[in-house]
Amino acid sequence: MTAMPRRTLVDLGVALAALALVAVTLEIWTSAFHVPPYLVPSPSSIAARLWTDAAMFGREAAITVGEASGGFVVGTTAAFVAGALMAQSRFLERTLFPVAILIKLTPIVAVAPLFTLWFGFGTGPKIAIAALITFFPMLVNSFVGLRSADAQELAFLQTLGATRSEIFRMLRVPSALPFLFSGARISLNLALIGAVIAEWTGADRGLGRVIFVANANLDLTALFGAVLALAAIGIAANAAVGAAERRVLHWHPIVMTT
């Protein structure tokens, strides 16, 4: 029980050391070669901006996280339901999968302005874009995971007279859990990207808007600060999913061997 936290702390320490090395190298490079701050700001100036405007970055980050979280919940829930239906019916698989492919191939950057035009500048379009971009990865993982149930275990439950709902609950869902957590990791990051893209196309709040305005004003310290804030949010989200996965799937070989 103690090996996992120790391994996690070691991994975190290595990651932080690598980030510190990159920051120190960049600081030395920008200082030694007198790199103009309007091209590449020094890490110290970015850190100072983050400290000075911490309240603003925190406020805008909370808005983006809320939009991404809403889109993640809506998109992954819809994807799981669709994946479950496809796993139970060949007809629905042939019917729904082409629609899912169409959603996957639709450029989000092209759709986002339309959502803003149709639904306004509120939170709804941002959540919709985040949901749209998270849908396909969770759909595929749900479908494959629910279909991955062991054939012998499935036959055994059928001989016991288990209903389809009982088989789904007792066999298919547990078999799909590793796939669902994998899909959640991908979808969380995509939800964040979707929220930022939506904020670029029509918003007055959020980290995406901060990046858009900072880029227009050549305010690179604010731009890099917002990017770092988004990176920190993504890292925290992945860490949360990883912790939940280890807690729920502590019995599974995929967790026990990592």
Q: Model regions: which residues?
A:
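C-terminal transmembrane helix and the adjacent membrane-cytosol boundary/short C-terminal tail
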Residues: 90, 147, 178, 224-258
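Generic hydrophobic transmembrane alpha-helix motif, especially the helices
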Residues: 101-137, 144-145
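N-terminal signal-anchor transmembrane alpha helix
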Residues: 6, 10-32
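Periplasmic/extracellular loop-to-transmembrane helix junction in inner-membrane transport proteins
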Residues: 2-4, 32-76
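Short cytoplasmic-facing helical segments at TM-TM junctions of multi-pass membrane proteins
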Residues: 138-186, 207, 211
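Transmembrane alpha-helices
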Residues: 128-132, 164-198, 224-225, 229, ...
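Transmembrane-helix boundary motif in ABC transporter permease subunits
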Residues: 70-100, 117
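Glycine-rich helix-loop "coupling/hinge" segments at transmembrane-helix boundaries
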Residues: 117-118, 193-229, 249-258
